[in-house]
C-alpha cells in the first residue's frame, strides 16, 4: 500500500502539461480546487472527471498512477461515505431501522463528498506527477515573491514545502524496506487484534523516525557545505516565462469554471 502513494513522485515526460509554467500549474490547481467544491450535481462531477482524464491523457501519464493515488484512501472514502450517509437526514427516507435512517439527502451528500475527495486527490497527484520539486519550488517562490516586500519568507516557505514533498517518496521507500526487513525477522502486521497490530507498527515507526532524522541531518549538512543561507542574493539557472500553452491551459480552466457556474445558476 505504501508504494501506491504517488504524492511527491514525478513522472518524466515532455508533454504539453509537463512544459507548462509551474506558476500556471499552481494557479490552475487553486482554481481547480474551487471548481471541485462548487460542483453540485452528477453531470458536473462527470464533466470535471472528464477534464482530469483529458489532462492525464495529454500528459501521457498512465491512468493507473491516478488509481494508485486513490488506493491508500479507500478506508477514508468508505468512512466518510458512511458518516455522511447516516448523519445527513434530509429528503425522503429510503431505509429506516432502529436509530439508522438513510435518506435521499444523506445518500446525495455521501456521494458528493466522496467524489470531491477523489477528484481533489487525482488533480493534486497529476500536478506533482508532471512537475519536478525544483520547478514547484521556483513557481511557488515567484508567486509569493511580492509578499517578500512586507517581510514574508517566500523562498524559505517554498523550500520547506519542496523538501517535504521530496521526502514523501523517500520515506515511503524507507518504510517499505523496514517493513520487509521486520517481516523477514518474523514480525506480523496483518493478523491479530487492532492493538496487536498497532504494537507491531512500533517496530516500523521507530526505525523510520531515526532514518528521517538522519536524512534531515545529512540534507542540512549538504546545504551548509554548499553555502546555502536562504534566498537572498541567489540567482536562478532557469528563467520562467509564460507561453501560449499557459494561456490555452488557463482558458480551458476558465471555460470549465464558467460552465459549472452557469449550470449551477440555471438548475
Locations of the language-model features?
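Transmembrane alpha-helix interface motif
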Residues: 1-42, 48-57, 142-145, 149-152, ...
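Membrane-helix interfacial "entry" motifs
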Residues: 14, 37, 60-65, 97, ...
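Alpha-helical transmembrane segments and their helix-start/interface "positive-inside/aromatic belt" motifs
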Residues: 25, 64-74, 249
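Transmembrane helix-loop junctions in multipass membrane proteins, especially transporters and channels
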Residues: 41, 45, 60-64, 88-96, ...
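Alpha-helical transmembrane segments and their membrane-interface exit regions
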Residues: 51-61, 76-79
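Loop-to-transmembrane-helix entry motif
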Residues: 69-73, 77, 114, 118-121, ...
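Juxtamembrane/interface alpha-helical elements of multi-pass membrane proteins
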Residues: 73-187
Amino acid at each position: 500500500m505504501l508504494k501506491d502513494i504517488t504524492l511527491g513522485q514525478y513522472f518524466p515526460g515532455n508533454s504539453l502539461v509537463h512544459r507548462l509554467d509551474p506558476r500556471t500549474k499552481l494557479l490552475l490547481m487553486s482554481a481547480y480546487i474551487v471548481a471541485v467544491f462548487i460542483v453540485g450535481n452528477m453531470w458536473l462531477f462527470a464533466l470535471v472527471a472528464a477534464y482530469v482524464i483529458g489532462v492525464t491523457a495529454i500528459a501521457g501519464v498512465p491512468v493507473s498512477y491516478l488509481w494508485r493515488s486513490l488506493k491508500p484512501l479507500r478506508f477514508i472514502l468508505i468512512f466518510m461515505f458512511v458518516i455522511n450517509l447516516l448523519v445527513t437526514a434530509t429528503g425522503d427516507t429510503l431505509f429506516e431501522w432502529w436509530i439508522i435512517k438513510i435518506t435521499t439527502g444523506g445518500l446525495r451528500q455521501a456521494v458528493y463528498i466522496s467524489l470531491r475527495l477523489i477528484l481533489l486527490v487525482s488533480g493534486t497527484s497529476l500536478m506533482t506527477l508532471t512537475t519536478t520539486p525544483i520547478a514547484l519550488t521556483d513557481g511557488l517562490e515567484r508567486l509569493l515573491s511580492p509578499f517578500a516586500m512586507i517581510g514574508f519568507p517566500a523562498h524559505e516557505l517554498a523550500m520547506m514545502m519542496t523538501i517535504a514533498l521530496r521526502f514523501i517518496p523517500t520515506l515511503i521507500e524507507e518504510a517499505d524496506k523496514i517493513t520487509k526487513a521486520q517481516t523477514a525477522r518474523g514480525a506480523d502486521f496483518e493478523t491479530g487484534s487492532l492493538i496487536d497490530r498497532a504494537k507491531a507498527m512500533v517496530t516500523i515507526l521507530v526505525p523510520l523516525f531515526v532514518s528521517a532524522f538522519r536524512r534531515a541531518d545529512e540534507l542540512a549538512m549538504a546545504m551548509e557545505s554548499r553555502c546555502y543561507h536562504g534566498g537572498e542574493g541567489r540567482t536562478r539557472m532557469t528563467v520562467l516565462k509564460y507561453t501560449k500553452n499557459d494561456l490555452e491551459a488557463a482558458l480551458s480552466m476558465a471555460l470549465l469554471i464558467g460552465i459549472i457556474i452557469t449550470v449551477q445558476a440555471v438548475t
